[in-house]
Amino acid sequence: YHGGTHPKGKTVPYMNECDVPKFSYDYQAPLGEFGQVRLSYHQLKLQHLFYQEFTSEITAAKTVLSKEAEVQTPEDVETLRYVVRADEQGHGFLYLNNYQDHVETIDQTDFCVTIQSDLGEVRFPQNGSLNLAKDACAILPYWFSLEGHLLKYATAQLITKAVSSHATYYFFSKIRGMSGEFVFP
């Protein structure tokens, strides 16, 4: 998560010179060797806020792979990468990924995803189609309880919530290439 610098050796110029880099071991970490805050830090921060706040919802869910995921290769940038995590009652999250290490991806355009659930069918989006920018990813909630108000789905990523004495506030983030939509049954 944070790059660094090996200290200079006392008896030889480099410590462990056969096993590790001479001095720098930054590796494009979210926080650079000299404290630089990179874009990946901000992207991970949003994801970590989500996982921290909604741990119980995520851990109660099981992963369901798409048919495409079972045969997809890393070089296949044409096929949408997605999986679902759903709990036994039918609440869940749609994970979309348009990034692949060491492969040049393209914008995913004009697609939709339909999920069958015990609570009912959910089509992302209800009408029309979605777009997901090159190298973007998203975790979209469906059949999600917002303090007793059931959200059928959102095409914005749930980030965290804040609770005050008078209300609970939910925070979402727009996904690159995607229009934000919130649908209640």
Predicted regions and their residues:
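Carbohydrate-binding surfaces of carbohydrate-active enzymes
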Residues: Y1-P185
